[in-house]
Amino acid sequence: GQTNPVDDGPVSFAALLRLVSATPGLMRLRFTTSNPKDLSDDLMRCFAELENLCPQFHLPVQSGSDRILSLMNRKYTVAEYLQKVEALRTYRPDIALTTDMIIGFPGETDEDFEATMQLLETVRFHGSFSFKYSDRPGTRAAFFDNPVDEQVKSQRLSRFQKRQDEISLERNAEYMDRVL
């Protein structure tokens, strides 16, 4: 599961990436995602070291509010997330970052949502997968008794996605007249 630690065993994932990267004739190497709490400096350093590692990374944040992240049991804060973003961009300045965002988690206030919008402005993701919260049976959140009104969730999601689309368009324009 997403909130369970990864046991890399005797070989770390970063070491495995380095081994795979050295495969003769391998022009492009991509891995998709990591939970921010499990993203090591060694793994981030691979983006600087491995020429064939694609400069794109999906780093799901879920919310820009520490309070909501705690309710989600995410095990990291917005500040810790931003440190990962800064490190990735230091190691690979041209890295394209994408994320996941859940809008309308139970108890999400206007202030929590505005914190999410602020994170969007700060990071300026190249893209995001964003959705309205919906109950999942068997999760702690399914038992929370303070749901966000569906109309409010829809309005917030629309606002978030509209701004993300604008940022994505600006980000995509940066690739004009470039060979990638």
Kindly give the residue locations of the regions a language model identified.
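Short capping/connector residues at structural and topological boundaries
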Residues: 58, 73-77, 138, 149, ...
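Short acidic (Asp/Glu) and glycine-rich catalytic loops that position anionic groups and cofactors
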Residues: 66, 97, 135-140, 161
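C-terminal, non-catalytic macromolecule-binding modules
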Residues: 91, 111, 115-157
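Terminal RNA-binding accessory module
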Residues: 142-180
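Conserved SAM/AdoMet-binding glycine-rich loop
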Residues: 1-110
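Hydrophobic alpha-helical packing residues
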Residues: 20, 85-88, 120, 160-164
